[in-house]
Regions:
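ATPase nucleotide-binding head domains, primarily ABC-like/P-loop NTPase cores
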Residues: 1-173
Length: 173
């Protein structure tokens, strides 16, 4: 969804037809993205460092008319530090830059009502035999739990592993 959103924004600004049924957007002065994982080990830069440098570039140069897309910021460190860094970046973008921002995270504490949260939900209409699950963007914070164990089942993990994963997941909710 994030990559497609970035692609549609750039294509529309170039005057190209975007691959969607419906779209409304404001022209952006810049588009900043941080998606995927990339390191530059030859330069001595880990995936986490590159991720932080990309985020810093967006914070330094984004304006109110920019689009910033960040996917799982903070995933390359401990949960404690990751949520702190992601929360700080999100707060800065919301309060200082005030740009349009698509911010994907697994940190539920960052999903605040004033930020217009949405979540990716597994399509209930999808066929159980589908190899690739279909997701839909839904408004609001994601419900407790995730589709992780269901996807692990589809991937063929052993029943013993799935049972233990369900127990651990339940205990951590």
């Amino acid at each position: 969804m994030l990559r497609l959103s970035a692609l549609c924004a750039v294509m529309a600004q170039l005057g190209c037809r975007a691959p969607c049924l419906e779209m409304a957007f404001t022209p952006f002065d810049r588009v900043f993205t941080r998606m995927g994982a990339e390191d530059m080990l030859v330069e001595g830069r880990s995936t986490f460092l590159v991720e932080l440098q990309d985020a810093a570039r967006a914070l330094d140069h984004a304006t109110r008319r920019s689009l910033v897309i960040l996917d799982e910021l903070g995933r390359g460190t401990s949960t404690h530090d990751g949520v702190a860094i992601a929360g700080g970046v999100l707060r800065y973008l919301h309060r200082n830059t005030r740009c349009l921002c698509l911010f994907a995270t697994h940190y539920p504490s960052l999903c605040l009502p004033e930020l217009g949260s949405g979540h990716m939900a597994l399509d209930a209409e999808a066929d159980e035999d589908d190899r690739v699950p279909t997701f839909l963007l839904r408004p609001g914070r994601a419900p407790r739990g995730s589709c992780g164990i269901a996807l692990a089942r589809r991937a063929g993990l052993p029943a013993q592993v799935l049972r233990r994963a369900a127990q651990i997941s339940s205990a951590n909710e």
